[in-house]
């Protein structure tokens, strides 16, 4: 077999180029600090399930139990801090809907305005959706199964059954998916992300 060689013409092949990656906004994955965990657990343990605390009328989830929780001091401070960390790591993204109106982020105060808990049971699900506001988050408090158990029960060509996912348009208009494969190791972990991220 003859060896094939690429002959480089210095007039055409001698040039500089730069690689530029295009990306969508990311997310922060963190462990919930003990002080925040204690406040949330206390709110959950003392939750009064009343028509006033029923959150189902204002949420997209197809769940039997969604309840408003009180906003506690440590939770509020933690979310405010994460807002700053997010902007430090990812910057202000135009897709977050703020770039046109908020040029100086040092003048902006982020406040946690709504907090709720979902008790997801068999057949309950959250459809693809976005949230209001600038940032949103999910904290997994209790996961009643191991990932391997889910994979055995729902055999398929993918792991979507046992996954939390973000879907977003990439820079060329395709749909990309980021999966978080949840198991007990995700208990008291938090994903913090732009509210418009599905």
Task: Indicate residue ranges for each PLM-predicted region.
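Catalytic core of non-heme Fe(II) oxygenases with the double-stranded beta-helix
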Residues: 113-192
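Non-heme Fe(II)/2-oxoglutarate
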Residues: 2-108, 116, 120-126, 160
